[in-house]
């Protein structure tokens, strides 16, 4: 079944299993990937390829993947892994790519993922891109924000269609929410937000 092929790891029931390596994060380390999920329908509209990058400083209580807080968890992201991701995503049954973690808005992850997103826009422009972050868009991802990287963040955000932002708050957990875990989190139409300069929520917010 093509929906269960391996991308840089061993495919098991739609999941790409990565060999874990637990070490403390060090500044300047190259991006690691904890898991790649194929045939994913839970993290965005339609059928998706989902990349769980490693590294997160939010450490939200109740996080469903605390092992991915470690920046060195999983496997080193390589050009070969990127090629396999592009090949997998090129299948017509995929609607797009989702970035999860860990947190794809950590500085090193922005830098590591930017070339992948640029390739998708060049080679697979029909695919949409979603990203999840525990950070808050207008506080952390704008000039002067704690996750804003000069020369990187604006390019990166301009390539993303939908951003789900905000930390997971266990006391606000609600299982009926669309594509998010707690009521404080927002599904942002990032294209319209970037165009208008004001937060535009996606109709999927419920």
Where are these regions (language model features)?
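Conserved Radical SAM active-site core
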Residues: 22, 28-34, 47, 65-146, ...
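N-terminal pre-triad scaffold of radical SAM enzymes
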Residues: 32-59
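Residues embedded in well-ordered beta-strands within globular domains across many folds
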Residues: 37, 98, 161-164
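Structural recognition of alpha->loop->beta junctions
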Residues: 144-172
